[in-house]
Amino acid sequence: MIDLQDLNIQQKIADYLADDRLDDINASSQPVIYKDTLYTKYIKRILDIVISFIALILTLPLNLILGIITYIKLGSPLFFKQERIGRNEKPFTLVKFRNMTNATDKNGELLPAQQRLTPIGTFMRKTSLDELLNFWSIFKGDMSIIGPRALPFYYYDRFSDRHKARFKVKPGLECPPWDEKHIKRTWENQFENDVWYVEHVSFKVDCCMIFKLIRYTFDRKTSMMRAQCRKGSFLGYSKDGKAISNID
């Protein structure tokens, strides 16, 4: 039986899908038009600096507590670091508190992520507390408050040209769905929402999305629905051009 949770098998499937259909999808997909405006060049960055600085000050005590708990439960290293795709495909290092053990199977291979997730890690994910250190990435200029979610580099070659347009802007804490019908998380909904954002980014849009992000965080029903929605790992595209995962 094929284990679709195995990263090596996922990569082989992704390579096959890219070779089999990515050229045809690129030839038929709609281009994405990004307009660099006064807001995107200057004002958005100023707002990111101000908001992230305030957030870092306000969350410092909480981050210290989370750091202590993480160290007690998991020891050293304290942080999880991973290279992610930034604006214009430039790499940056995403830093979070560790929330998984390094438990392995009898062959020395790491167990699946869900089996290594600690209770405190589960709590941090459900409450988005694992996102707090991202304010440092925003303050440094690697990320923005609003923008497409930062993804690992091994996804890059799986993207269509249309969806690669999401890298024309900085990644963000979240890019809430503009269309409430797409609140359920699927890769297709997420990527199409990302490219919509790239084409429409403005002060008004960012303000609306910040409000939605706050609402999602504190609305228990919405946050639970989103937390329980599993997307799996992005593998590529179906023959009709829809983004698919290992659980589709």
Placement of each model-derived feature along the sequence:
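Short, glycine-rich, amphipathic interfacial segments at transmembrane boundaries or analogous
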Residues: 19-23, 80-116, 174-193
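Short acidic-aromatic low-complexity motifs
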Residues: 125-134
